């Protein structure tokens, strides 16, 4: 694959006309992202909606600026994100209506964007398109959110962020995870990769570390599981693997509360990062060459 040119705009500004909004508009044309769009194209602008009451998401003005230029090129943009894989107290985008409420909380609405704001994988996160990835290192297929897969062009509008699996998230993570349906997220998190005896995605359990009912978060842990596979009593935690659908809610809840009774296996992370790149390739394969542009803040 040929090396791609990367443009950089300094965030420093001596006056208001040098702020990030006009710089983003200038960069849109300097990087020739306008050439991705033909008149009448349906254009997915893939962002991250953020999580409820958290501030690590793009400012709406930065997204609206790109929407305006896509429309100026004759495109028909829509701003989108997907539902999350996990169902737990720290996630506010597990289903479509909650995702849109979170988007509105952060200023991503049709009124502020000047275009529709949609959940690309549908209300339940199961609206997808299966895509073969022949060159994938680990994954040979991806399940791309339908609204993205059916778009004519895409602007991948990312921002730098931390991520518990990827460590660092940018443009690859924004579509490698954020461009997948729930089924795609299960797949790329390696929940069902390998033989049942060595699924890398299965949680590593250390029941001897569980405080049982003495843990102040034991009710939160139980409530985090949408399948009732996780139960805590005075003897500690009990896990029913047959009920588990590998949404990682128990692991993330336990880890985020500072405990390590349910964690990822040590060798999980490098493989998951490779799978994420394979999944991102799957998203790219749904578009014709030259129909995707990437921009990161």
Regions found by a protein language model. Give the residues of each.
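Extended, low-polarity segments enriched in aliphatic/aromatic residues
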Residues: 2-62, 68-69, 73-80, 86-297
């Amino acid at each position: 694959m040929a090396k791609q040119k990367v443009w950089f705009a300094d965030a420093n500004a001596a006056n208001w006309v040098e702020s990030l909004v006009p710089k983003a508009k200038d960069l849109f044309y300097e990087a020739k992202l306008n050439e991705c769009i033909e008149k009448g194209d349906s254009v997915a602008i893939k962002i991250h909606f953020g999580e409820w009451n958290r501030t690590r998401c793009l400012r709406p003005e930065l997204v609206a600026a790109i929407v305006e230029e896509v429309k100026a090129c004759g495109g028909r943009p829509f701003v989108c994100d997907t539902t999350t894989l996990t169902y737990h107290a720290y996630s506010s985008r597990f289903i479509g209506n909650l995702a849109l409420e979170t988007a509105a909380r952060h200023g991503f609405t049709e009124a502020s964007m000047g275009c529709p704001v949609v959940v690309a994988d549908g209300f339940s996160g199961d609206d997808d398109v299966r895509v073969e990835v022949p060159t994938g290192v680990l994954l040979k297929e991806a399940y791309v959110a339908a609204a993205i897969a059916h778009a004519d062009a895409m602007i991948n509008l990312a921002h730098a962020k931390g991520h518990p699996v990827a460590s660092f998230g940018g443009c690859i993570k924004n579509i490698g995870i954020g461009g997948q349906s729930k089924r795609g997220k299960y797949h790329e998190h390696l929940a069902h990769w390998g033989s049942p005896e060595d699924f890398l995605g299965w949680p590593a359990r250390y029941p001897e570390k569980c405080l049982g009912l003495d843990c102040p978060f034991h009710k939160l842990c139980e409530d985090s599981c949408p399948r009732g596979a996780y139960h805590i009593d005075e003897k500690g935690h009990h896990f029913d693997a047959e009920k588990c659908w590998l949404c990682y809610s128990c692991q993330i809840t336990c880890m985020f509360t500072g405990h390590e009774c349910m964690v990822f296996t040590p060798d999980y992370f490098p493989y998951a990062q490779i799978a994420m790149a394979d999944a991102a390739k799957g998203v790219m394969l749904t578009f014709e060459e030259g129909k995707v542009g990437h921009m990161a803040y």
